[in-house]
Amino acid sequence: MDVGELLSYQPNRGTKRPRDDEEEELKTRRKQTGPRERGRYREEEATAAEDTADDKKRLLQIIDRDGEEEEEEEEPLDESSVKKMILTFEKRSYKNQELRIKFPDNPEKFMESELDLNDIIQEMHVVATMPDLYHLLVELSAVQSLLGLLGHDNTDVSIAVVDLLQELTDIDTLHESEEGAEVLIDALVDGQVAALLVQNLERLDESVREEADGVHNTLAIVENMAEFRPEMCTEAAQQGLLQWLLKRLKAKMPFDANKLYCSEVLAILLQDNDENRELLGELDGIDVLLQQLSVFKRHNPSTAEEQEMMENLFDALCSCLMLSSNRERFLKGEGLQLMNLMLREKKVSRSSALKVLDHAMIGPEGTDNCHKFVDILGLRTIFPLFMKSPRKIKKVGTTEKEHEEHVCSILASLLRNLRGQQRTRLLNKFTENDSEKVDRLMELHFKYLSAMQVADKKIEGEKHDIVRRGEIIDNDMEDEFYLRRLDAGLFILQHICYIMAEICNANVPQIRQRVHQILNMRGSSIKIVRHIIKEYAENIGDGRSPEFRETEQKRILALLENF
């Protein structure tokens, strides 16, 4: 407490209710202090009837104690002081454990030791400013002891440990000393930190503010460790974190910062991780995601934070659909019907629903979803979006190009996977209304062909400069150039040309004649389309088996024979 506070001090009269701003300040002050300090404030409130002399006496004691703490903080942080701190921590932890065992039914006997333990945990936050000294936490078994305290009977202690671990694993701090960070993360992983954190999460009551903060800090530890060491995501998920996240997401609680954070951590765990995607499917996670997203089929998110959560859940769903077994679960869970509804409702969720459908139908694994999509009259939904991109795309970050990319990818998947009567229904769409959909396809073709020609000209100029400098264009550089071309519009152009090849091979003369007629009118040729499709075939199937790649290449190139 500083001099200003002392001078402005007024003893608590006990009758007047604190103003809202005073109440808020009191709450903030409570949050920033440990249990011992919080106890002090509670005493001040409870003893409102004490006279001014006693209040002043207590104030002087507080000032003296704060002064002593400041003197202690001024001690320079080095190996010796950290070792001393760890030794004090171990002693207090052991003493508290001993007293709890000796007097299990008499809290008065061990409460003082618990407050002392909490105090030293708070002091250890200073170690987070020196990641080079993290090795001492491991060598002196402090990490092991801290992990043990995550199961402490008093959640105030476990929350204090979580708060400390969150600060120690702060990603910026970890990058300050790679060596110190590696040692700490190794010790945490070896100690099964994820399993212990989940066990602690299970008992926290989020209606209590401090415990809700504990949940938030726990999720921050996971995020920090996942960013520093992505491979730990699999262990964390298997040690119960994935199950807890799903349970927390579907809990009937008002939307808050913790629910948003859960959605974010879930998306992180599923990123490029087939094991976690499979585990989520086994835990009925696809149904949980669909249930949570169903809220947004007719209602827009009410805040920017709720919209961010919605996008995280959509990202998680798209990630899961990379796995064929989850496509089946998505189909059985009526995911197609939900996404189709979202497209029709024209809410903020529409753009993301389109992306989900793209992931659900792509490749041979999407065949069943493609057939079901036609059964639920999805063609009536997708073609209006193909004919005209929404003028106002409300979702932040969604562009007209992304919209057209997903729509064309969906149509390409439908043409690849549909058979029989459903394929006929799809092809008939290209002949109705004087082949207006063929006209739209050709319009998009020239739009993205033009964009590609601009990008290719720029890349050729860069290649020329590289050669002129006497440098060699290696495979890595060629890959980089190809990725840039895909991003500039080649990706969508390949899908457009593939759609052209498919519909021209459908034995519907009207379609083929219209395609050739428009190409001639615009001074273009089949050769350009053939070249784009050949390049598409050469680069298809990355990450798949050689057999699939070879079969798919033959199938695509066969389309060119009758084009």
UniProtKB/Swiss-Prot annotation:
| InterPro entries according to UniProt | ARM-like (IPR011989), ARM-type_fold (IPR016024), CTNNBL1 (IPR039678), CTNNBL1_N (IPR013180)
Intracellular or extracellular location(s): Nucleus
Give the GO terms filed under biological process for this record. Answer: adaptive immune response; apoptotic process; mRNA splicing, via spliceosome; positive regulation of apoptotic process; somatic diversification of immunoglobulins
Q: Name the GO cellular-component terms.
A: centrosome; cytosol; nucleoplasm; nucleus; Prp19 complex; spliceosomal complex
Q: GO: which molecular function terms? A: enzyme binding
Tell me where it mainly resides.
nucleus
Where do the coiled-coil regions begin and end? 476-540
**Which gene name does the record give?**
Ctnnbl1
Q: Motif Nuclear export signal (NES): which residue numbers?
A: 130-140
Q: Name one Pfam family in it.
A: CTNNBL
Query: How does the entry describe the domains?
Result: The surface residues of the concave side of the superhelical ARM repeat region contribute to, but are not essential for NLS binding.
Q: What does this protein do?
A: Component of the PRP19-CDC5L complex that forms an integral part of the spliceosome and is required for activating pre-mRNA splicing. Participates in AID/AICDA-mediated somatic hypermutation (SHM) and class-switch recombination (CSR), 2 processes resulting in the production of high-affinity, mutated isotype-switched antibodies.
Species per Swiss-Prot/TrEMBL record: Mus musculus
Ranges spanned by the short sequence motif Nuclear localization signal, renumbered to the chain? 16-33
The entry describes its oligomerization and partners as: Component of the PRP19-CDC5L splicing complex composed of a core complex comprising a homotetramer of PRPF19, CDC5L, PLRG1 and BCAS2, and at least three less stably associated proteins CTNNBL1, CWC15 and HSPA8. Interacts directly with CWC15 and CDC5L in the complex. Interacts with AICDA; the interaction is important for the antibody diversification activity of AICDA. Interacts with PRPF31 (via its NLS). Interacts (via its N-terminal NLS) with KPNA1 and KPNA2.
S-S pairs: none
From the Swiss-Prot or TrEMBL record, give the protein name.
Answer: Beta-catenin-like protein 1
HEAT repeat positions in this chain? 79-129, 134-176
Q: What residue intervals traverse the membrane? A: none
Keywords for this protein: Acetylation, Adaptive immunity, Coiled coil, Immunity, Nucleus, Phosphoprotein, Repeat
Q: Where is the composition biased (Basic and acidic residues)?
A: 34-45
Return the Acidic residues bias intervals.
66-78
Provide the residue span(s) of the region labelled Disordered: 1-81
Q: What are the start and end residues of each ARM repeat?
A: 178-228, 229-273, 274-323, 325-363, 364-417
